[in-house]
Amino acid sequence: MNPATHLYKTSVLAIRTAALAAALFVTTSAPARTAHTANPKEGGGNAPAQSDPDILRYNNPGLTVDLGVGLWGIPLPVDYDGDGLKDLLVSCPDRPYKGLYFFKNIGTPRHPRFAAAERISEKGMNNIRLSEADGKPYVLSKNFEYPDFFKAPYAKKRRLHYEGEELGATYNKSRSNMWSYADWDGDGDKDIVVGIDTWDDYGWDNAFDSLGRWTRGPLHGYVYLLENTGRGYVNRGKVEAAGAPIDVYGAPNPCIADFDGDGDPDLICGEFVDGLTWFENVGTRTEPRFAAGRPLANKHGEIRLHLEMIVPVVSDFDGDGHPDLIVGDEDGRVA
């Protein structure tokens, strides 16, 4: 493991996000069907009674299940149908469910509940990210913004140019490259915050010696700032915390918001495994400066997700004025 992610074991105060790792739920609406195994006592083709232990019921109407899309769920929280409730779009970039799915919120702001998924695009894109700026949702991927995404997904894209060193150019292997808009320095424009990981030190999970000792290095996850100067974007390099570049255990997926309610933007990062790291802004609104990272926790302890490859996205999901975290997981579920 990356020492940077396990150096801090002090509990961070519970912040005003609903970041508990609780699964969201979907109510199915398909007709009920039954199947049954062969039973020699039945004779002929008689259907078994409902109490028969051999019955296997499926497609039960009204059944509540975990919201999910299959492999590598990437959530995009947005009021997709314009009814005032945040819904969920979830991108699944791989087989067998590849595509973009719409989950309509049929609950309430405080108690969201979702209808069964509707596939709205056969294209399921990896490293796609929703961010909110100027009170509007935007969808970005590496080097691009997708205008009118919620009317016609992927139909249009606009290249995002920047000056300076090419991001990730020196990395041989990178799996996570997430871009989001944020007003980094409080000047009213949209800067771009980028999270990139590199697997160059780690390699793959076959680097144990005969004694079970790890022989390579950790995953690395860095955060970069592309500042909007009014004339274009400029790469300002890696974002630092406590005087050193932020480096989480892969897949940083940076989330920028005023999480502690003190008027300046803080930073929460994900990682390739199952935790979140909280970086408090100890600077100002116009000149952010971050304290050393601490595991995100509340009164119950450190917040952990069910699996790994987590994708946190910041959104005021329940409309109470406080930023929440919507987190995708490796198996496609969303917390």
Model segments located where?
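Positively charged, low-complexity intrinsically disordered regions
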Residues: 7, 17, 34-37
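Bacterial N-terminal signal peptides
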Residues: 14-27
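Polar/charged alpha-helical tracts
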Residues: 12-13, 136
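N-terminal secretory signal peptides that target proteins for export/translocation
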Residues: 1-12
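Beta-propeller-forming repeat regions
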Residues: 29-335
